Amino acid sequence: MDLSYFWFEEEDIFDLLNSTVGIEKESLRIDQDGSLSQHSHKHGGFGNRSFHPYIQTDFADVQLELVTPPSASADELSAWLQALHQISATAFEDDFIWPSSMPGQIPDDRDQIKIAQLEDPIEYNYRAHLVDTYGKDVQLISGIHFNLELNPKLVKSRCASWG
C-alpha cells in the first residue's frame, strides 16, 4: 500500500465530520496545604482503577484520569467532562483538583507518592518500570489526551478501496 497520497478525498468531508472524539484529562488531587493528597483513590468511593470506567487513576494513585466516552459533539464532550470533574470534586471532599499540568509541590520523600493500585500485575510493573527509568516526578506531569475515532464507515470504505 502506497501511503504517499492523501488518505481522504474531498467527498469524504461529511463522513469525516461524523467522527468522534474522547478526552482523557489527568489531574493531581491535593490537600488544603497544596501537598499531594494522602487519600487513596478508593477513599473517594471509586474502588480500584477498573471499578469506574470514567473516573480512574493514571500513574499515581493521587492522579485522577477523567475519561469521556466518544462523542460527535463538542457540547456533549464538555458536559461529560464537567460532570466527571464535579463528581470527582464532590467524592474527594477534603481534596482539591490541581488545575495545572505541573505539580505544585512534590514531597521530599518520594515514597509518599504511591503508584496507582492496579489489579493487573503487568500494568503495575509497567508503572514501576517508569519509576526506575524516569523517576516519579516526571510521571506526575498531567495533561489532556484527545482520542480521535475516524468514522468507521469511512475507514472501512477507504481500506476496501486500497485493496
Regions found by a protein language model. Name each.
Residues 40-118:
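Active-site acidic/histidine clusters and adjacent loop/turn architecture
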Residues 6-14, 50, 84-85, 128-133:
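Short alpha-helical segments and helix-capping/turn motifs at coil-helix boundaries
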Residues 106, 117-133, 140, 149-163:
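Loop-rich catalytic cores of soluble enzymes, especially ATP-dependent carboxylate-amine ligases
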Residues 1-48:
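Long, contiguous juxta-domain segments that are non-catalytic but functionally important
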Residues 89-92, 135-139:
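Short, charge-rich binding segments
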Residues 22, 59, 139-143:
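Short, solvent-exposed loop/turn segments at the edges of secondary structure
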Residues 29-33, 68-77, 150-154:
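A generic structural motif
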